[in-house]
Swiss-Prot record:
UniProt keyword annotation of Oxidoreductase present: no
Protein's recorded name: Peptide chain release factor 1
Domain of life assignment: Bacteria
Residues where N5-methylglutamine is found: Q230
Amino acid sequence: MSLEENLSRVVARHDELRALLSTSAGGGEGFVRMSRELADLAPVVEAIGRLDDAKAELAGARALLDDPDMRDLAREEVLRLEAEIPALEHGVKLLLLPRDEADDRGVILEVRAGTGGDEAALFAGDLLRMYERYAQERGWRFEVMEASDTDIGGIKEASAAISGRGVFARLKFESGVHRVQRVPVTEGGGRIHTSAATVAVLPEAEEVDVEIEEKDLRIDTYRSQGAGGQHVNTTDSAVRITHLPSGVVAQCQDEKSQHKNKAKAMRMLRTKLYDHARQTADDARAEARRVQVGSGDRSERIRTYNFPQGRVTDHRIGLTLHRLPEVLAGTALDEVIEPLIAEDQATRMAEIGG
């Protein structure tokens, strides 16, 4: 379907909804649903109107180019409108893109050390701190839900809840394998080692999103463990919850209170189940995303952080920045995220006639 056909379809649907609502008695689910759809279409139709007006003005200005008295003024108008119309078209295409209903949600961020032993765990800690600083930069709330530390200050695995406006929209392309190339602190010979850590970004679920029945849960309690596996609590305050039908597991041991650990574990479990259902229900969109920016599968390397060269390379879009310290500090992470969002938008716009 061409862009023009898409625009005509949107305007026709907008007019149809207005007519239906004007003759409706109001109330009921159908009325509410149509009202919401009309509200969603209103800014699109307004943008289409501005685009149509600009195209009409351009046609009028071009018609005056043959008039000796108006030629200079008409030429200026033609140049202005020819520069303005592509931007208006781009704005309309962005509004036509289907919204990911999860974009406005917070996320559960999971970071795990991959290949590379102690160095991989140290790098996993670097990534977790990078996202924490980035959250602070954007005014989001960052809360560690679960962390398994190593003796030398690294992280085997950790989960964090990030809350704020549009968190998932900005972080969803961070899922995948992140690779680091540097000389480990434990390396005496100065040799560069390659290690990896995995990142998963799950849109956080609300209670209304996922129905969890108590009979489907197995709840185990155990003693919290610190670095090296030693027990750090004399009571069974740590909680592990298994959703029996799916096999999904969530656990938490960060709080001293078993009640608080259970609440956090349930929050993570709900999010994991929501993400599973969301992906299952929309395989087509998941496949489109795999084509556009990579699947975020744990086996896929998405980004390399090269310390000797001070370089960050995102392999999905061929982007290289020589600003590694700033990226890891969270202050320049947007310089990686913005191009990924733009690439995703460009690919989806092409699908609607762009």
